[in-house]
Amino acid sequence: MDKRKFMKNRKKRVLAAVLLCCLFVVSFGLSGCGRSGNRESGAAGEMQKTTQTVPEAEAQKPYPYVFQPHVMSAEYKDKYGEEIEQIFYDFCDAALAGEESFPCPDAISYYAVFDIARSCLPVASAYTVIEENQPQNGIGKITYTVPLEEYKERVQEFKDRISWWITGCLKEGDVPFERVVSLYTALTNNLCYDYEALESSIDLSPYRALMEDRAICQEIAGAYVYLLLQTDVNACLCGALSRDMSNAHEWVMVVLDGQYYHMDPTFELDTFVGLRYFGMTDEKRQQEGDYPISYFNVAEVNGLDQSEYAAVDQRFAPLWNTAW
């Protein structure tokens, strides 16, 4: 069976089960109080809106996807200030066009832009390198690792691949919750964990996860963030060391209805048609893998106060031990 047909068929089963669970949770009033404010790119509203019924005719139309050159996790502005958004978008415009420089005021912003690009413009992150002593006179240098014409071809292939992911599992009228769960299952259905990657010289990046069928945690997490941002759902990376410091792991924090949730599509690769690691609270995330809450590195930028991004809402708890 074609992978995308499989994704669509499974989406129906997943959404039916998830919506039933969510309605059950709403009826018993489980709720939380995560960080509030304008954290969502899409219009989500209350839980009732998240689970609203979409007309059948609208549900059959393909998702009206258009590539968005400017997407960025909102949490980066908390770390670097509001001005980083425009600086990063200037970088995006330059990098997508294959230009060799972009306006950049200082070294902190220059390094931040390349760090942000890992999950917010993976194709540029994969084919550029950070130069020393940048910027110069307010201009940051962009150096590509492949010939310019080849790079431009890679950019177009990347755009086409993002469209493949999104239109393959989403329909017009899908609300933010549906986009979040559908893209989650699309990744977990189509990717295999690359156990050999850490022993090789492969360049690990979210770009590889999006373009190929094999990846590891930091690649899968970044891929999921980017797909969500492209569909107007705010999400960011999150990582931590295990309590005994024996391993590091990276996953995703997603905002739905003003609440933060932990999503771990990498761990889900080892489960059987379930959502054990979907919509986790801080406590559940800590339990699954023994990653102490105090170790959580929100947006992977070192310095954001984890308590300001607390994930405490338990609406998805019924899913964690459910299989279908």
Each predicted region: which residue ranges?
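Sec-exported extracytoplasmic/periplasmic mature domains
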Residues: P122, T167-K171, T185-Y193, V225, ...
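Secondary-structure boundary elements
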Residues: K152-A209
